[in-house]
């Protein structure tokens, strides 16, 4: 008789252990979207390539959407990886693919169709859809006037959905959707008369209209709407909740408003005449002095385009001008400032630019270390214009009002008070034309934006000096352009 070991108890134990292991494994939750982002150390974002969202210039990546998302990624402690969509439909398609981007930030409006494609965050920017037409053509005043016009909009856009709804009420309305263009292209097509009308959001029009002097607003199509970020519908709520908490935080602490001011706070200072004039001067005058701007800017560690923007605000790039207050030359230097900067001939363009660059660098260096960029540049420009003493008076007024004296957004609210006795009587340096530096800075920021945009496609060399200037969509009409300078250097500008 042979002994046969009974394996049944042992098998039973093995089966029980295996079952428990499988049950425990089933109970382990897979990482949430937010946890996955943090574990990977990367936040994948998809956006559009445009001035209002994301683009690259000589200084690297920039754009309103980019900066807002970059700060969010920094808050999470992860790297931001950016992908650009070919068009709006592509953006949603990419987000809905397995392993696709987890965040979409492209100035998106929540619509019934899009709610099926993604989930939307809290809002961060209010915009108004606007019908635009070419100056000189018959101006539409209501939706009925759109019938019989050639209209092109971005394919898959909220504007296309608006027009589809209007068509139900106006059967004669026809429009085209294009996936081969961006907003800049649509505005160019209107500007050049290739199409009759297009529909764009107010923020993108404000940022781009300077490049297209012939474009005009016909009317607002509907109420203001809110832009939001999106996450893919298949994701859990963890990332969306974190996004909403972040957007609420930057709204409350003023970060969002400062970003809005940085990108949109100065875009409406230009008019048609100023735009047309700057366009001409950009091509006819700047090439003569561009090398001087670049050389002096490099020596003083200043962006040459910012220096050129200052020069345009001061003299419209004219080396022989003299104001009634005695400031002279392309950079409109006072006699005392010129002497302090080593300028022997203020009417010599090269010397004037060198002196202006040196003076601006000096003024910027004198600011408190607590002032960080980009506010440091804007406050330095204000000081360059009105004088460091008056700027300090405005900063103290801001502090007394519970505002931040290191932020241009707050200080610019106080500067006009320097012209009111109620306020300047309490300051150390007294009366000043405080409204001037506000306009001075706004104009320069706009000129600088334009110079940055028109030079960014070509990272080496100069498009201006080489005669290859390309202002998006303006080659057949006129280049970009802000208004003629409101004034020259303030007589309140101190000598060193």
From Swiss-Prot:
UniProt-listed GO biological process terms: cell wall macromolecule catabolic process; cell wall organization; peptidoglycan catabolic process
Keyword Membrane recorded: yes
InterPro entries in the cross-refs: Lysozyme-like_dom_sf, MltF, Solute-binding_3/MltF_N, Transglyc_AS, Transglycosylase_SLT_dom_1
Compositional bias (Low complexity): 486-496
Enzyme class: lyase
Renumbered residue ranges of the record's region LT domain: 268-496
Keywords: Cell outer membrane, Cell wall biogenesis/degradation, Lyase, Membrane, Signal
GO CC terms, sorted: cell outer membrane
Reaction catalysed by this enzyme: Exolytic cleavage of the (1->4)-beta-glycosidic linkage between N-acetylmuramic acid (MurNAc) and N-acetylglucosamine (GlcNAc) residues in peptidoglycan, from either the reducing or the non-reducing ends of the peptidoglycan chains, with concomitant formation of a 1,6-anhydrobond in the MurNAc residue
Active site: 314
Signal peptide bounds: 1-29
Localization per Swiss-Prot or TrEMBL: Cell outer membrane
Region called Disordered, residue ranges: 464-496
The protein's Enzyme Commission number: 4.2.2.n1
GO molecular function: peptidoglycan lytic transglycosylase activity
UniProt domain comment: The N-terminal domain does not have lytic activity and probably modulates enzymatic activity. The C-terminal domain is the catalytic active domain.
Family affiliation: In the N-terminal section; belongs to the bacterial solute-binding protein 3 family.
Role noted for this protein: Murein-degrading enzyme that degrades murein glycan strands and insoluble, high-molecular weight murein sacculi, with the concomitant formation of a 1,6-anhydromuramoyl product. Lytic transglycosylases (LTs) play an integral role in the metabolism of the peptidoglycan (PG) sacculus. Their lytic action creates space within the PG sacculus to allow for its expansion as well as for the insertion of various structures such as secretion systems and flagella.
Protein's UniProt name: Membrane-bound lytic murein transglycosylase F
Organism per entry: Pseudomonas savastanoi pv. phaseolicola (strain 1448A / Race 6) (Pseudomonas syringae pv. phaseolicola (strain 1448A / Race 6))
